[in-house]
């Protein structure tokens, strides 16, 4: 047996050392995250505290890539998200008339909110649906209540 590992020595020794954990995996993880030389075997009473101290910096490093860049302050991040064009929600086929009308009013028929970077709008009031064309909020609600439309219970 030319290359014996720590676990092989523990198996051969037997006795009190047979209960000792194999620290090979922990050593490899420590080397991976830059904690070389930490081969100390934790004591029974202190194991959870030691594990949380060792794991806290690694989980923090792992989640940093998913967060926003550190050069953006929270205020800048907020305004960037507020001013960027929003995508229309995915439309479901089985929507009721009221929710469809509200969605159309909020998002518009072309899927873009009015004045939020809608492409192809030359005038500033092209996306506005108001009293002139009769497709505002109240008009759409009153159109829903016409006879012959809606659920069979209302007719």
Curated annotation (Swiss-Prot):
<comment type="function">
    <text>This protein may function to maintain proper structure of myelin.</text>
</comment>
<keyword id="KW-1003">Cell membrane</keyword>
<keyword id="KW-0472">Membrane</keyword>
<protein>
    <recommendedName>
        <fullName>Myelin basic protein</fullName>
    </recommendedName>
</protein>
<feature type="modified residue" description="Phosphoserine; in forms C1, C2 and C3">
    <location>
        <position position="84"/>
    </location>
</feature>
<comment type="similarity">
    <text>Belongs to the myelin basic protein family.</text>
</comment>
<feature type="modified residue" description="Phosphoserine; in forms C1, C2 and C3">
    <location>
        <position position="139"/>
    </location>
</feature>
<feature type="modified residue" description="Phosphoserine; in forms C1 and C3">
    <location>
        <position position="122"/>
    </location>
</feature>
<dbReference type="GO" id="GO:0043209">
    <property type="term" value="C:myelin sheath"/>
</dbReference>
<feature type="modified residue" description="Phosphoserine; in forms C1 and C3">
    <location>
        <position position="121"/>
    </location>
</feature>
<feature type="modified residue" description="Phosphoserine; in forms C1, C2 and C3">
    <location>
        <position position="140"/>
    </location>
</feature>
<keyword id="KW-0597">Phosphoprotein</keyword>
<keyword id="KW-0007">Acetylation</keyword>
<dbReference type="InterPro" id="IPR000548">
    <property type="entry name" value="Myelin_BP"/>
</dbReference>
<feature type="modified residue" description="Deamidated glutamine; in forms C1, C2 and C3">
    <location>
        <position position="12"/>
    </location>
</feature>
<feature type="compositionally biased region" description="Basic and acidic residues">
    <location>
        <begin position="37"/>
        <end position="49"/>
    </location>
</feature>
<keyword id="KW-0164">Citrullination</keyword>
<feature type="modified residue" description="N-acetylalanine; in forms C1, C2, C3 and C8">
    <location>
        <position position="2"/>
    </location>
</feature>
<feature type="compositionally biased region" description="Basic and acidic residues">
    <location>
        <begin position="123"/>
        <end position="134"/>
    </location>
</feature>
<dbReference type="GO" id="GO:0005886">
    <property type="term" value="C:plasma membrane"/>
</dbReference>
<feature type="modified residue" description="Phosphoserine; in forms C1, C2 and C3">
    <location>
        <position position="135"/>
    </location>
</feature>
<keyword id="KW-0379">Hydroxylation</keyword>
<dbReference type="GO" id="GO:0019911">
    <property type="term" value="F:structural constituent of myelin sheath"/>
</dbReference>
<feature type="modified residue" description="Phosphoserine; in forms C1, C2 and C3">
    <location>
        <position position="73"/>
    </location>
</feature>
<dbReference type="Pfam" id="PF01669">
    <property type="entry name" value="Myelin_MBP"/>
</dbReference>
<feature type="region of interest" description="Disordered">
    <location>
        <begin position="113"/>
        <end position="155"/>
    </location>
</feature>
<feature type="region of interest" description="Disordered">
    <location>
        <begin position="1"/>
        <end position="72"/>
    </location>
</feature>
